[in-house]
């Protein structure tokens, strides 16, 4: 018989490691599983030098958070361990974050943390401890498929859904992961925390970039990649210099404020040219992109990716964590994966993720995704038509 975590065996015979960040979500996850009789072990990862961030609201995995996680574990009567992952986190997350910004991208460090640390190293530790599952406080859910594997689903609470940050999870990892909060709202989670008597019931939510103690990510980049702070030109779509900047890391695609340019019409950042240290700006209508080239694609849908795509796979995609999934097509073009956005999207930035879904409503299935390498305004048919016109013109010149 399967227990509440869809595992064989009685709860009291089932060890579950809970990733405890010190926040209300992971604390309630541990409390729920403990109340159901599971053999719960709490693990907190110390991910960075927390001295400057100890008392900053919104920090995660810092000194105060470790203290809170330890207190919750003591309240629940479960063993709790703190593992030092600072070196690993710096190598795989912080340095990649700085590299990405220096190359003109807008990275999502939470995705790398989940992929490189939490769902790889911590999961391996959970297995070594004899656990049957690793549970987290993410607002997503999963369900067993007919073949015994598991599908990743969006949270019931669409305002709290965190599936965007978990697209890189592998099938093997999904089989071992459990997400007890997937059907809850944040309000319900806090109410449970109060019912369990947890001190973190009203604690502030953590922010995305947990390792930036001052809240200014450029401080991290200037220390690790000083060349990224070199000044350069701000140019318009025709390449005319209309201003200057103090480093491309201060900008992201879609940005309007802080350009320092006097203009009759609003200007937006359209792209970042790291090689030439140029920030390209233009009108809002130039922000809309219709095609996206992806890298590092992960597929957790049914079957093999290329077979699923065929001549083209109709699905929904999310290009920013705060946006709703939009209709799109996924294709293989010249050996690379491309997404065509049916209605187009503004502010599509390299370094962000493009996540695949089978629908746009709550608890839709996550099919995978990839990182945005490049975005283009032209639709595929427009590009093909232009290519054909150029070829015809060239042929005519040869005949002439």
Curated annotation (Swiss-Prot):
Function: Catalyzes the 2-thiolation of uridine at the wobble position (U34) of tRNA, leading to the formation of s(2)U34.
Name of the protein described by the UniProt record: tRNA-specific 2-thiouridylase MnmA
Disulfide bonds: 113-210
Alphabetized GO MF terms: ATP binding; tRNA binding; tRNA-uridine 2-sulfurtransferase activity
Enzymatic reactions: S-sulfanyl-L-cysteinyl-[protein] + uridine(34) in tRNA + AH2 + ATP = 2-thiouridine(34) in tRNA + L-cysteinyl-[protein] + A + AMP + diphosphate + H(+)
Binding annotation for ATP: 19-26, 45, 137
Stored CDD domains: MnmA_TRMU-like (cd01998)
Keyword Aminoacyl-tRNA synthetase tagged: no
Any one of the GO BP annotations: tRNA wobble position uridine thiolation
Keywords, comma-separated and alphabetical: ATP-binding, Cytoplasm, Disulfide bond, Nucleotide-binding, RNA-binding, Transferase, tRNA processing, tRNA-binding
């Amino acid at each position: 018989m399967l227990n509440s975590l869809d595992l064989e065996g009685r709860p009291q015979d089932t060890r579950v490691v809970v990733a405890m960040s010190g926040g209300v979500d992971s604390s309630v996850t541990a409390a729920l599983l403990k109340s159901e009789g599971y053999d719960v072990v709490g693990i907190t990862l110390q991910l960075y030098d927390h001295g400057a961030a100890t008392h900053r609201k919104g920090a995660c995995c810092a000194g105060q958070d470790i203290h809170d996680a330890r207190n919750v574990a003591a309240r629940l009567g479960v063993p709790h361990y703190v593992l030092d992952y600072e070196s690993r986190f710096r190598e795989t997350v912080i340095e990649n974050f700085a590299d990405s910004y220096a190359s003109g991208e807008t990275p999502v460090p939470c995705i790398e943390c989940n992929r490189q640390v939490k769902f790889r190293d911590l999961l391996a530790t959970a297995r070594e401890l004899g656990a049957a599952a690793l549970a987290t406080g993410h607002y997503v859910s999963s369900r067993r498929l007919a073949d015994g594997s598991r599908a990743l689903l969006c949270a019931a609470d669409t305002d709290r859904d965190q599936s965007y940050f978990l697209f890189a999870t592998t099938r093997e990892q999904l089989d071992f992961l459990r997400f007890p909060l997937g059907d809850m709202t944040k309000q319900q989670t806090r109410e449970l925390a109060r019912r369990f008597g947890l001190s973190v019931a009203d604690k502030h939510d953590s922010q995305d970039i947990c390792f930036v103690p001052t809240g200014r990510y450029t401080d991290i980049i200037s220390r690790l990649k000083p060349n990224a702070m070199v000044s350069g030109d701000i140019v318009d779509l025709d390449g005319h210099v209309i201003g200057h900047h103090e480093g491309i890391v201060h900008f992201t695609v879609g940005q309007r404020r802080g350009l320092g340019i006097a203009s009759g019409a609003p200007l937006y950042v359209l792209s970042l040219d790291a090689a030439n240290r140029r920030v390209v700006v233009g009108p809002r209508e130039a922000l809309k992109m219709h095609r996206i080239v992806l890298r590092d694609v992960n597929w957790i849908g049914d079957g093999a990716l290329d077979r699923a795509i065929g001549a083209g796979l109709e699905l929904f995609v999310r290009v920013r964590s705060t946006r709703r999934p939009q209709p799109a097509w996924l294709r293989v073009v010249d050996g690379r994966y491309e997404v065509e956005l049916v209605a187009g999207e503004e502010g599509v930035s390299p370094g962000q993720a493009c996540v695949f879904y089978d629908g746009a409503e709550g608890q839709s299935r996550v099919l995978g995704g990839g990182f945005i390498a490049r975005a283009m305004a032209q639709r595929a048919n427009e590009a093909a038509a232009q290519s054909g016109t150029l070829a015809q013109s060239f042929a005519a010149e040869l005949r002439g």
